Amino acid sequence: LRILETLGLADQADVRAGHLSHGDLKRLEIGIALGMEPELLLLDEPTAGMSPEETAAQAALMQKLVAEQGLNILFTEHDMEVVFGIAKSITVMHQGRVIADGRPNEVRRDRHVQAVYLGEEL
């Protein structure tokens, strides 16, 4: 129940996973991993297919896990605003090659990242 409370799902403890919303199901998947008490949590596209509200809640959950539990999270994500809002260090790849690596403010200013992911010209 502690993990469900952390996830904000305690009120849905009796709901079958198949009846949860997409966002709640993704949070439950994180909860399953948390049950193993990992030192590092690997997430692949943790906000994929989510509404803006679900995306914000998922990002807040990730930040909470880092801040309150000291959990390290390594994640892949195409929503650059989510990345810039959460990550302390970012590695950006394009076509299998690293095009930038650094702190969020450095990566955001990188001209290759701007051209490829942020829609600005070189």
What are these regions (language model features)?
Residues 1-122:
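Glycine-rich phosphate-binding loops of nucleotide-dependent enzymes
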